[in-house]
A protein has these predicted regions:
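Active-site lining segments that contact anionic ligands and/or coordinate catalytic metals
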Residues: 236-238, 283-285, 299-301
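Contiguous C-terminal substrate-recognition/catalytic subdomains in enzyme active sites
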Residues: 178-279
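A glycine-rich, Thr/Ser-enriched phosphate-binding loop motif common to dinucleotide/cofactor-binding enzymes
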Residues: 116-125, 199-208, 314-318
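Short glycine-rich, acidic/polar surface loops and turns
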Residues: 272-279, 283-293
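Helix-loop-beta segment of a Rossmann-like dinucleotide-binding subdomain
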Residues: 110-117, 187-198, 302-306
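Short aromatic/hydrophobic contact patches that present stacked aromatics
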Residues: 64, 238-240, 303-305
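N-terminal Rossmann-like NAD(P) cofactor-binding subdomain of oxidoreductases
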Residues: 1-184, 220-221, 255, 286-287, ...
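Glycine-rich phosphate/pyrophosphate-binding beta-alpha loops
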Residues: 228-230, 309-313
C-alpha cells in the first residue's frame, strides 16, 4: 500500500512513522511548506518531507492526518474522495456520519466509510479496559480522573517541561508557562484544554462524548476530571465504575482483563507492581491494576488504575489498527508490531531528545 503521513514531524506523526517502519508499505512524509524538502530521521530511516497538497495524496491508499482540527476540517473530506483518511484530530469525532473507531472494541461497526476519526488519547486508553468490562457486566456509570503527560500537548510542551525542571529553584519563583497555563515542573495543573460553560474542560467533555459513542451507550453516565502532571510520556487514569450486573469475583475480572487484547494486567500491589507511566511508556498494551471493589457501590462497583502510552495506544497505534481494519489486512500483519525497546546505551533519555526535536 501507499501511505501518506501528513504532519509527519509532530509527536504523533513521528510515532506513526515508527510503526510503519519495516512494514513494506510505501510511505510519503508530508508537512507544511516550512518543513518541505528537509530530511526527517526516525530510527534508522530517513525521510524527505514533501509539502502537503491534496494532489500529492491522490495516489495514496491511506492518508493519516496528524494535524490540527482546523486543517482536518478543511482537507479531510477532499482527501477522502481518493483515499481512506484516518484523522487524529477531534474535527470529525462527533459527526454522526463519521465512525469513531477503537478496533478491538467497536471495529465490527465499520461499514466502509472513507473518513474515520481516531479518538482522544485518554478515551482510547480507557476504552481498552472499559470495552471488555461493559461486554461482561454492563456499564452503568464511569468516573474518570486523568493524569496526563506533557507530550499530550505536543513536542514543544515536552521541551518546556524539561527546561523548566532543569531551571527549577523553588516554588513561587516562576509560575509562568508557554504551553500550559502555569509552570508544570514539580506541579500539577487541573486544566487540560479550555473550560466549557458547564465548568468542565473541553478535554473532559471529549472523554464523555467519546466513551458514549464508541460503546454505543448514548445515555451512559460519565464524569471526568483531567489533570496535567509533570511526566513526559504516557497518561494514567483512575477509574470508578458502576455496573448493571454484580461483580462478585475479582479473580474473574482479572482473568477477563488478562485475556483482553491490548491489555496488560499489572496487579500485584503487595509486590509494588501496578500501572505507572514509567512502565507503560513505549508499551503497546494498556496497563491495568489496583483492581478492587468500590466501597460505595459494593459488588456493583470497581475501582482501578490504568496507564497507557498516549502517543501509541492513545493515538498512532490505534490509527495503525484502523488502517489494518479498513485495508482488511490479515492477522499476520500485526505480528511484526512489537513494543519498541527504549535505548539503553545513551545517557540522554530518548524522551528528552524527542522533546528537543
Amino acid at each position: 500500500m501507499k501511505i501518506a503521513v501528513v504532519g509527519c514531524n509532530g509527536a504523533v506523526g513521528v510515532t506513526m512513522l515508527e510503526l510503519l517502519a519495516n512494514t513494506g508499505h510505501e510511505v510519503k512524509c508530508m508537512a507544511s511548506s516550512r518543513s518541505a524538502n528537509t530530511k526527517l530521521k526516525v530510527g534508522v530511516s530517513e525521510y524527505l518531507i514533501s509539502e502537503f497538497s491534496v494532489a500529492n495524496c491522490a495516489d495514496c491508499d491511506i492518508v493519516f492526518l496528524c494535524v490540527s482540527g482546523a486543517f482536518s476540517l478543511e482537507f479531510g473530506p477532499k482527501l477522502a474522495k481518493s483515499s481512506c483518511v484516518i484523522d487524529n484530530s477531534s474535527a470529525f469525532r462527533y459527526h454522526d456520519d463519521v465512525p469513531l473507531l477503537v478496533p478491538p472494541i467497536n471495529g465490527k461497526t465499520y461499514r466502509g466509510e472513507r473518513l474515520i476519526a481516531n479518538p482522544n488519547c485518554s478515551s482510547a486508553i480507557a476504552l481498552m479496559v472499559l470495552g471488555p468490562l461493559h461486554a461482561r457486566y454492563g456499564l452503568e456509570s464511569v468516573i474518570v480522573s486523568t493524569y496526563q503527560a506533557a507530550s499530550g500537548a505536543g513536542r514543544p510542551a515536552m521541551q518546556e517541561l524539561v527546561e523548566k525542571a532543569r531551571a527549577f529553584e523553588d516554588y513561587n519563583r516562576d509560575n509562568s508557562g508557554i504551553n500550559f497555563a502555569h509552570n508544570l515542573a514539580f506541579n500539577v495543573i487541573p486544566q487540560v484544554d479550555n473550560f466549557e460553560s458547564n465548568g468542565y474542560t473541553r478535554e473532559e467533555m471529549k472523554v464523555v462524548w467519546e466513551l458514549r459513542k464508541v460503546l454505543n451507550l448514548p445515555e451512559l453516565a460519565v464524569s471526568t476530571t483531567a489533570v496535567r502532571v509533570p511526566t513526559l510520556r504516557s497518561h494514567a487514569e483512575a477509574l470508578t465504575l458502576r455496573f448493571q450486573d454484580p461483580v462478585a469475583d475479582l479473580h474473574a475480572v482479572r482473568e477477563l482483563l488478562r485475556n483482553s487484547p491490548g491489555v496488560d494486567l499489572v496487579d500485584q500491589p503487595e509486590q509494588n507492581q501496578y500501572p505507572m507511566p514509567m512502565t507503560s511508556t513505549y508499551k503497546h498494551a494498556v496497563e491495568v491494576g489496583r483492581i478492587r471493589h468500590n466501597l460505595i457501590y459494593g459488588e456493583y462497583g470497581l475501582d482501578m488504575f490504568i496507564s497507557g502510552d498516549q502517543l501509541l495506544r492513545g493515538a498512532a497505534l490505534n490509527a495503525y489498527e484502523i488502517m489494518q481494519l479498513v485495508a482488511d489486512l490479515p492477522e499476520s500483519a500485526s505480528a511484526q508490531l512489537h513494543d519498541p525497546e527504549p535505548p539503553r546505551s545513551e545517557p540522554a533519555s530518548r524522551l528528552a531528545r524527542a522533546a528537543h526535536g
